[in-house]
Amino acid sequence: MNNDNTDYVSNESGTLSRLFKLPQHGTTVRTELIAGMTTFLTMVYIVFVNPQILGAAQMDPKVVFVTTCLIAGIGSIAMGIFANLPVALAPAMGLNAFFAFVVVGAMGISWQTGMGAIFWGAVGLFLLTLFRIRYWMISNIPLSLRIGITSGIGLFIALMGLKNTGVIVANKDTLVMIGDLSSHGVLLGILGFFIITVLSSRHFHAAVLVSIVVTSCCGLFFGDVHFSGVYSIPPDISGVIGEVDLSGALTLELAGIIFSFMLINLFDSSGTLIGVTDKAGLIDGNGKFPNMNKALYVDSVSSVAGAFIGTSSVTAYIESTSGVAVGGRTGLTAVVVGVMFLLVMFFSPLVAIVPPYATAGALIFVGVLMTSSLARVNWDDFTESVPAFITTVMMPFTFSITEGIALGFMSYCIMKVCTGRWRDLNLCVVVVAALFALKIILVD
């Protein structure tokens, strides 16, 4: 009997080794399983944060919990099987806040129409991938603008986190002011942030998850939330699947929003794929990684599918580097992550015991990570640093990621032309800047 079990396990391991080419990548099934669990623990916070954010757009948090798990599970498994890369996918932080607080909240657009904008942005990304334009765009967008976009989104997310904790509140004279720091909600939000930063500085991979658990337990103690169980059959999601308003999103008013969703997702996912595969030692001398086109297809198709089932834009997660750090080198790592997300679907009642301040610390911490790239800007060259600065600060100050990107691209062209360095411009930058200028003239 024991011999039969041993043979079965050996055969299963052999199948996985052949399917994911483990020997060629110098890894084992055990290492890939550990790597998958590590990546999952570092990014599972998204199943709590995403429902909180999209809930602000009048979407049912429990349904969003399920769709988040579903798309993260299927997307990660697809990345593992088709591209054989240790990269996990899930709804993107930043774009979910943009959707909920700007597109739906500030602009007053229904979540169904907002999802339509995400859908068309994802379709655009797929077409760019199909016609091999995506890699050309990545290569031709200046580093300063890419950094400005990333950092601006980081500040935007941090602003949402500070607002959710109550650290900052509205003021009619000064726009914002410090909140009531004696409030237990504010104090717990601050506590959650420092739990993440301290644990992360000690290289603890599940820092964000621990912070959410600790502050949620405190929320139970103070009566801010109420325990309603742990396990349940996933709620019906038929009310959101296919509810995207595709025709309503195809308007001039939303053209800039659609373009922003596409552009941000293009930079975010492509940059993450390159970063993770580079850390895994999979990048060749030409800056490309194995199955690059397959990975880009999986990424863009996942975003289309995500909008269709009712969740925000899907992207590759930089947290995948945590799995790579412990030895993950193949798609088996991503498959393990995907399976874990699918299993988590059966724990939707847990969403109800996570108060807003419990996830706020994660938002602020993501802001810290994203703004750290500003150190790479050449601050001595004003034709590079000024557009990066404008892009970064105008996102939170205008409460619009789209406006930040638009002003960044246009200021880049202005600075280069007015300083006589117009030869630094390329077709991609000029076209994007011109499109945004036309949007401002014709629509705004």
Swiss-Prot record:
Top-level taxon of origin: Bacteria
Protein keywords: Cell inner membrane, Cell membrane, Membrane, Transmembrane, Transmembrane helix, Transport
Database matches in InterPro entries: Azg-like, Azg-like_bact_archaea, NCS2
Ranges in the topological domain labelled Periplasmic: 54-63, 102-113, 167-182, 224-251, 310-311, 347-357
Pfam families reported in the protein's UniProt record: Xan_ur_permease
Biological processes annotated in GO: adenine transport
GO cellular component terms, semicolon-separated: plasma membrane
Protein name, UniProt field: Adenine permease AdeQ
Organism expressing this protein natively: Escherichia coli (strain K12)
